[in-house]
Amino acid sequence: VNRHHTGIAHWLPALLLAGVLVFASDLPISRHLLGTNLIQGPYASLLAASTDLGPARPQQIQLTAALAGHQRPDDLIDWTHDRGLTVSWRPSDDWAIVEGNPDAIARAFDVTVHDYRGKQGQQFYASPQQPQVPEALRGEVTELGRILGYTPHHVSRPDIALDVPDRGLSPDALLTTYNADKLAADGFTGKGTTIVIFAFSGYDQKDLDTFSAMFGLPQFTPETLGDPLPVAHGETTMDLQVAHAVAPDARKVVVNARPTVQGDGAYQKIGKLFEDTDRAYPGAVWSLSIGWGCDKLLTAADLAPVRSALRAAQSHGTTAYNASGDLAGLECKGGTDWDSVPGPDDIGLDSVSSIPEMTSVGGTTLSTDDRGTWLAEQTWFDVPLSQGTGGGLSALFDLPPWQQAAAAQVAPERRTGKRMTPDISAVADPFTGVKIVLNGDVVIGGGTSQSAPIWAGLTAVMDQYLLANGGTLIGEINPLLYRIASGAPRPAFRDITLGANAVDLAGPGYDLVTGLGTPDIDNLARNLLIAQRIQA
């Protein structure tokens, strides 16, 4: 039996648990729009679940244009000017923003633009059609983004297991599990590094103080970039404590990401937020547990500002981790934005986590002894709760060169030439996770939103180790991870071969549920130092 087999025979039973399949083509569509580049899938579901308010009211709307290079887009500027539109572009960017009123946008790109009211009461503009690159611009513009003034998003809330007596990993046990205890004993605790948590909600300082006192860690008060965050919901509290458990001497920063989903232009705003964070904290390690919409809602052009800003930060030494998601490979489920019977359209990835330069972090169920010594791990998948590690194939990005060898290890029908996620994993099961303090109570954290800050903390430790031994900050880590996995002096990953999510199975080598596996940090740090010396 091929352990990686992931065809319809595998995931169909899981989807049928909730009902029969429906397809986006069954959604009601206005007759006059048929055959005019209609967008299908989750995007169509979003509009079908919203109230069509008619032609968009006069306002400035926008879409993103991905450019073929970094030169000034003179053709685009002239073309849009002739049609009553404007272009925003900065020197050296490989993307631009086209803006104008809805009528001008509609005429220029031969689309319909209406206003909609969503299920949550939000009002936004959208076109049910995908704008095409005009023939006159095809030498300069490679792709256009969606015309959509709303970004479906979710505020992650940690999966908390309230009835797990005497279980959960202490900070010392967590270090032991991933073989980072030796580095900690040698004084590598993240000193001199910075960990940035991107967040939609706040935290309770009393919980941070109690956590630190309980486990004998230094007290800390995070810095904040942006306006003060609203009331704590648990996610940011967990992220901070988990990162502190691994790297207690690293500086902690919370970045208010909530403005990115207020109004339109979310991905341009995310790119700007990344730039601001890089400017304020160059070389920091980033942890993201925010869902900024699934990849099937977008085009790659929409994410161009995010990808550009991430690359720039990585050139300054930043390493970035993003949770792969907790919907077991079904990240395109509608949630509060639309209702539908489970079907193929649900299969998808978190959009930002799928960017090739972003390190996507999956989740596992962990078994250890009382001291945290690693015994076993398997894929995290809770079928009754429809929760589990995210992962799968990108709808937007081609397979990067550093994943070529890994692609040969997945099932033949999954070798589509597209970016694969996750890249790596850490414990996410809320019944086997890390002890945290929330609202004054000791509970067990969970979700891939726990896995990402674990890796962020471990990377802060590795950065300190590398700098102390003549190395450099890691920066973009993905190519290094895959190179080390394909052959290095020390085994750096524990291969997770058991389990599945709703779409794929784990198996030997790389798989689409846990990636390369979970880390042996002592070995990984030493391999990275060797790789840096060879490259130098």
Walk through the language-model features, giving the residues of each:
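Short amphipathic alpha-helical face segments that pack within enzyme cores
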Residues: 16, 453-461
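Secretory targeting and sorting signals
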Residues: 2-28
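An often Trp-containing, charged/polar helix-loop segment at the C-terminal end
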Residues: 365, 410-412, 463-512, 532
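A short, structural micro-pattern
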Residues: 1-3, 15, 57-59, 352-355, ...
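Substrate-binding/charge-relay-adjacent region of secreted/lumenal peptidase catalytic domains
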Residues: 25-92, 97-98, 102-360, 394-447, ...
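Polar, glycine-rich mid-to-C-terminal structural blocks
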Residues: 356-396
